[in-house]
Amino acid sequence: MIETRLLQPVTPADLVTVTRLHDDVEAVDGHPSLGEAVWRDLDQPLEPVSAGILAIDDGRPVGFAYVYRSDSFSPAHWAAGMVVHPEVRGSTGVEVALLERAVEHVAAAGGGLVVLWVFEPEQHDDEAAARAGFRHQRDLLQERVPLPLGEEPAWPPGVEVRPFVPGQDDRAWLSVNNRAFADHPEQGGWVEATLERRMAEPWFDPKGFLLAFDADGLAGFCWTKVHPATDADPELGEIFVIGVDPSRQGSGLGRALVVAGLSHLADRGIGTGMLFVDGDNEAALRLYASLGFTTHRRDRAYEREVAPA
C-alpha cells in the first residue's frame, strides 16, 4: 500500500533520498523529472511554506512531489514538480496520492493557484492530473539546434551591442524585461531581488548576457546559459531569456539577438543550442524553425485553484 509523508522542511537526508530517486528515474527516462527551479528551492527555500511529499511503497521511496512559492511568478502562485518511479506509474495511484497531499498542504497554507509541471507528459499524467482536480494550462517546448549556425546577426541600423554590466544595467534591463513579458507567468514582474538571485547562480556569466542599444536606450537582450554535459545530454548552450522592447518589435532585432547569442555559445565551443518556447507561440516557433531548431522535449503545465482550508 502506498504511504505518503509530508516533508517540511526537506532535510539534507531527505534530499539525498529524493536525489537518488530522481537519478534512478532519469536514467530510465532519459530526461529529468524535476526542473531547475524545484532544485533551487529545495536547496534554499524562499519561503517556509515549501514542502515535499514522499511516496513510500513497502518501505521503498517510489515518488516525490514538491510545492513552493516564489516571487519569480507573476501573478504570484504555487509551483509543483513530481517524480514517480516507472515501476509504479499510472497503475498504483502514486501520482494522484502525491498531488492530493500537495493540494492539502497548499490549502492549509492559505490556498492559491498551483501550477504543476510535467516533462514529456504521457496519457497517465493527464489522467492523474485530472483526477487530482488539475486542468491543462499550457505546453512548453524545448527546441535544439546544431552549432555553429552559419549565419551572422543582421542588426537594425544604429544598434550597438555589449555585455551586461551588473550594478549598472540592472534597472534598465528589468524595465525592458517586464514590458516584453508583461503577461508571462514566469518571466514577467521581476524585481531587483529576482535578478540578483539569478546573478548569484554559479552559471551566471555577464559575457553571455548581451544587451542591444539604440538611440533611445536598451532595445533588447539575449541572456545565455551553459549547461554542463550529463549522462543524458551533451554540453548545452541555452538562450535563457530573449526579449525585445515592445516598441522595437518587428525591426528584426529579435532574430539578430538570437543569432548573436548562439554565436557567443558556439565561440565557447558548444555544439548544441537550446531554448524553451510556449507551444502556442506560432511567431516564435516560425523564427526558430527558420534558424534550424527542432523540438527535443515537451513540458506540460497543469493548474488548479485551491481554496484555503
How should these model regions be labeled?
Residues 1-40, 154-188:
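Short amphipathic alpha-helix that is part of the acyltransferase structural core
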Residues 4, 77-79, 161, 239:
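Hydrophobic residues on conserved beta-strands that form the core of alpha/beta folds
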Residues 22-109, 115-119, 219-234:
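Conserved donor-binding loop and adjoining core beta-sheet/short helix segment
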Residues 72, 117-120, 135-148, 274-277, ...:
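Conserved catalytic-core motifs of GNAT/GCN5-like acyltransferases
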Residues 85-88, 245-247, 251, 279-280:
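Active-site acidic-Proline motif in GNAT/NAT acetyltransferases
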Residues 96-100, 104, 108, 120-138, ...:
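Conserved active-site alpha-helix within GNAT-family acetyltransferase domains
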Residues 181-227:
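Phosphate-binding active sites in nucleotide-utilizing proteins
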Residues 240-243, 249-276, 287-289, 293, ...:
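Hydrophobic multi-pass inner-membrane translocation pores used for secretion
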